[in-house]
Regions:
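Conserved coupling segment at the C-terminus of the helicase ATP-binding
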Residues: 2-193
């Protein structure tokens, strides 16, 4: 079966690729979810579910502590070499959330909790593929909220991995110049036309 990948507006793919293979977490999101979980704990009567909620709260606190330590050392912007202990804390957050979700098919403030869960999952997925083309940095957003971001600097490896799953890839764009730059950034090889 002949399979082709058609990419329109290919000049945008480099920047989109950087964003697709990047992820960020905001420290204050962990505190917001922790507050919700504490309120759930206060109202929970089932001891086994109370235990699960408490465990989830502790994993949120552990992730928050790692972020807080970095926040204290970061004035405006700092590049770090790895996510260190945060990765383990995030694995716990994700696993503990899944236990809570089994007990609460309808979560209070569901959107806030799910948003953090999906951000954590995305961060872990991007972190799993972390290589020399990525950077991890700490900074503050426009509202002065502290965040950690894995930034894909060169998406060519990830894009090439996708393109290797098909027989051919055709890029459409009126502005793929300079051609060598785009060829390199889009995962092209020397022999590619």
């Amino acid at each position: 079966l002949f399979r082709s990948l058609l990419v329109d507006e290919a000049h945008n793919l480099v920047e989109r690729g950087r964003e697709m293979y990047s992820a960020r977490l905001v420290k204050e999101d962990f505190l917001a979810v922790k507050k919700i979980v504490k309120a759930m704990e206060r109202h929970e009567k089932r001891p086994e579910v109370h235990y699960i909620l408490r465990k989830f709260e502790k994993s949120l606190e552990a992730a928050n502590r790692v972020l807080l330590a970095w926040k204290r050392e970061c004035d405006e912007f700092e590049v770090i070499s790895d996510a260190g202990m945060l990765e383990f804390a995030l694995l716990r957050v994700a696993g503990d959330y899944e236990l809570v979700a089994k007990e609460y098919p309808v979560l209070p403030e569901r959107d806030t909790i799910l948003s953090l869960y999906f951000d954590v999952r995305r961060f872990l997925a991007v972190l799993e593929k972390f290589d020399e083309s990525d950077r991890i940095y700490l900074d503050y957003d426009e509202e002065r909220k502290f965040r950690i971001k894995i930034q894909c600097m060169d998406p060519s490896g990830c894009l090439k991995e996708v393109m290797e799953r098909v027989q051919s890839t055709i890029f459409f764009s009126a502005t793929l110049l300079p051609i060598r730059y785009y060829k390199e950034q889009l995962g092209g090889e020397k022999e590619d036309a």
